[in-house]
Amino acid sequence: RVVNRTGAVIATFFMLITPDMLGFSSLSGTNVIHAVTASLGVIYLAVWFRYRERKDLYLASLLLALNIWTRTEGIVFIGAALCVVGYDSFRRKQYKDLLPVLLSLSPALLWSLFMKLNGLYAEGIAIVRLFWDGEKVETIYNYMKNLYVNNYYYGWSFSAALLSLLVNIRNVIKTRDNLRLLSMILLASLFYVIILYQIDYKWDTIENVLAYSAKRFLFCFVPCVWFFTVTNKIVMTG
């Protein structure tokens, strides 16, 4: 529906051979499963923005709900979706479009209710006050920068997306081509960095979390950036 066959083949092929993602596909962890639900939730929202078919909005919201059910950090994708869909809904005065995305938070709310009713408590690791730690910021920046440019982990995923953005920047500015999808990707990335910053690392070092957990979390962005790459106007029209 969105991209021609050649673009679909190219994006699917390079996504499937993403080195580190391919390696983790053989394990029983939740990383790749989470990547599937999170990325498809974002992608179907991008499809909904193009065609405005309600089924795409509902499917996107369901996938985002599964995403946060799989891993708590998935809230960053719901947060990004709420920002973009919320802005679009208020601009068009179609407020009901925001409801399905809001409902995607229900698994987290139900889990919190279940824990409270059963007297289950987890030690809080979030720092809920505002603070500044320059060393922590520098550590997060350096590790995340190195992850995004690491072709051994993610193949050409982020490099191709950046190139696609640069050659299509005129359409992005003038006609907002793929701007909503780009906004969701960037906002989710920003929210994840904020979470990394606001965590009190009692059980492990921040370096280990960035080197291993964050590395696997970025799997979620691989399908999103390939979809962005092959659906840009200048790429589709040659």
Predicted regions and their residues:
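Hydrophobic cores of alpha-helical transmembrane segments in multi-pass inner/ER membrane proteins
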Residues: 40, 81, 157-166, 221-231
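Transmembrane-helix signature of polytopic, lipid-linked glycan biosynthesis machinery
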Residues: 19-26, 66-68, 111-116, 186-212
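Transmembrane alpha-helical segments of multipass membrane enzymes and assembly factors
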Residues: 1-8, 47-50, 232-235
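Membrane-interfacial loop-to-transmembrane alpha-helix junctions, especially the N-terminal start
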Residues: 7-11, 56, 96-101, 175-186
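Membrane-interface transmembrane helices that cradle and orient dolichyl/undecaprenyl
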Residues: 41-57, 236
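Membrane-interface alpha helices of multi-pass inner-membrane proteins
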Residues: 11-16, 57-72, 80-82, 105-106, ...
